[in-house]
């Protein structure tokens, strides 16, 4: 099944502050689920965003 993360979990995973996490929500960078006053994140969404922003430094010099 799907794994859901708290904001605190996401901050630790991404090494960001709660304010930065709020900014990511405001800028629609991270999708989230709001149930009542609680906000949670799908782990798969976080991993997808990390993959989409992966920058490889594998450059080949001739």
Describe each model-derived feature in a short phrase:
Residues 3, 28, 39:
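Flexible coil/turn residues that form the inter-helical turn or adjacent wing/linker of helix-turn-helix
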């Amino acid at each position: 099944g799907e794994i859901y993360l708290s904001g605190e979990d996401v901050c630790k995973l991404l090494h960001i502050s709660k304010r930065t996490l709020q900014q990511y929500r405001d800028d629609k960078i991270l999708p989230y689920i709001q149930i009542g006053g609680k906000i949670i994140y799908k782990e798969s969404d976080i991993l997808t965003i990390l993959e989409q922003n992966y920058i490889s430094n594998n450059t080949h010099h001739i």
